[in-house]
Amino acid sequence: MKIINIKIIRNNINNFSLPQHITPGSAGLDLLACIEKPVSILPKETRLIPTGIAIYIEDIEVAGIILPRSGLGHYYGIVLGNTIGLIDSDYQGEIMISLWNRGSNKFILYPGKRIAQLLFISILRVKLSLVKSFDPFMKTIRGVKGFGHSM
C-alpha cells in the first residue's frame, strides 16, 4: 500500500472526517465540502469549493484524479466544472473542487457534504521521439480517422 501525505489546511475540517474509502471496494476516497455555512449554487453557476486538505504525492509515477460523484450529477445536475481534475505529484496546495450546477434548480451545498472522489493512478512516463512519418509497414486499420470514425 502506498502512503500519501495529507495536511489539514482549514481548521473547520476537524468537524468532518478526512478522505476515506466508504466501503472496502471503493476505488476513490470521498472529498468533503469544507465550508462553514451552506452555499447556494444557482443553475448554470460554478463555485470553487475548498476541501480543507492538501496532499503531497511526491512519487512522479503517481497522480491524483478528481472525479465527480455520480449521484450529485444524476439527481441534482451538480458536476465538476472542469469535468475531471488532475493533481500532479509535486502539487502541495489545497485541493479545491469546481462544482457546476448544470441543472435548472438551485442546489444548496451543506458543510461536510461529499462532493467529489479522489482516485490515485499510476503514470507511465514517456519520452517523445520526433519522426517525419510513421513506418508504412505499421499502418493501422484506423489510420488518421478521428471523431466519429466508427459510427
Swiss-Prot record:
It catalyses: dUTP + H2O = dUMP + diphosphate + H(+). InterPro entries: dUTPase, dUTPase-like, dUTPase-like_sf, dUTPase_trimeric. Its cofactor is Mg(2+). Substrate binds at R69, S70, G71, N82, L86, I87, D88, M96. It is an enzyme of class 3 (hydrolase). One of its GO terms (biological process) is dUTP catabolic process. It comes from the Bacteria. CDD domains: trimeric_dUTPase. Its EC number is 3.6.1.23. Keywords: Hydrolase, Magnesium, Metal-binding, Nucleotide metabolism. Pathway: Pyrimidine metabolism; dUMP biosynthesis; dUMP from dCTP (dUTP route): step 2/2. The keyword Nucleotidyltransferase does not apply. NCBIfam families: dut (TIGR00576), PRK00601.1 (NF001862). Belongs to the dUTPase family. HAMAP family: dUTPase_bact. This is Deoxyuridine 5'-triphosphate nucleotidohydrolase. It comes from Blochmanniella floridana. The lineage of its organism: Bacteria, Pseudomonadati, Pseudomonadota, Gammaproteobacteria, Enterobacterales.
